[in-house]
A protein has these predicted regions:
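Conserved phosphate/metal-binding and DNA-contacting active-site motifs used
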Residues: 1-176
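Modules that initiate DNA replication and primer synthesis
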Residues: 22, 114, 140, 169-222
């Protein structure tokens, strides 16, 4: 893989709106002297990317997923106990941009749905990567390359991907409970609200008469 091809690849990814940053050659660690904040320094700026790879021509290519509006299912398919095949049996996995990782796993890259959260583990041997980053072809790790299985555009992330996120499930449950509790509280107080409204309405009707009445004492009422 030539230096020119690596730079061209990084610039090509950036032209798609993907936020790119340099990673230490043959490693997964951000290139510290160039990106002090790691993947948070990722950019789409062609000028900045050219400057980085001019200074570090052999740097791996890192992709900040969240900043790029992407989410990745990282499947360790090379592990004997990987549970992805069983997990996906009753679900639809859209065809999408797919990459072979250097370790022998698979990256399914999707467009993230706005407002969804994608942290944590999907199942045994499968991670959902969103808040961090992945390496892109033609990067290498421990001498092994990343390479694309296809050149498809990232498909929209399936709904079940977000639903599997513990944080997303907890947030949805909390919102539903809050809405239900609020509605129940309002309904319970409704009779009292109606009663108070009627009293106020009647008081307004009698107010002119009361104003015309002369003051009187309690003894006058007996």
């Amino acid at each position: 893989m030539t230096t020119e091809t690596k730079v061209s690849a990084a610039l090509s990814y950036a032209s798609k709106g993907w936020h790119i940053f340099p990673v230490t050659p043959n490693k997964k660690i951000p290139y510290g002297s160039l990106v002090s904040k790691g993947h948070l320094n990722a950019t789409t700026s062609a000028a900045q990317i050219t400057e980085w790879w001019t200074e570090a021509p052999n740097a791996n290519i890192g992709l900040n997923l969240e900043a790029s509006g992407l989410v990745c299912i990282d499947v360790d398919s090379y592990k004997s106990d990987c549970g992805f095949d069983d997990f996906i049996k009753d679900k639809h996995l859209p065809q999408t941009l797919t990459q072979n990782s250097a370790s022998g796993g698979t990256h399914y890259i999707f467009k993230a749905n706005s407002g969804d959260s994608y942290p944590g583990t999907l199942c045994k041997g499968v991670d959902i990567k969103y808040n961090g980053y992945i390496l892109l072809s033609p990067s290498c790790f421990d001498g092994r390359p990343y390479d694309w299985q296809n050149d498809l555009e990232p498909a929209q992330a399936p709904d079940w991907l977000a639903k599997q996120s513990p944080k997303a499930q907890s947030l949805r449950h909390h919102c539903c409970q809050c809405t239900l509790s609020s509605n129940q509280g309002y309904l319970k107080s409704l009779p009292m609200r109606v009663g108070i409204t009627r009293c106020l309405s009647e008081w307004v009707q009698w107010l002119p008469v009361v104003r015309m009445m002369k003051p009187f004492t309690v003894s006058q009422m007996i």
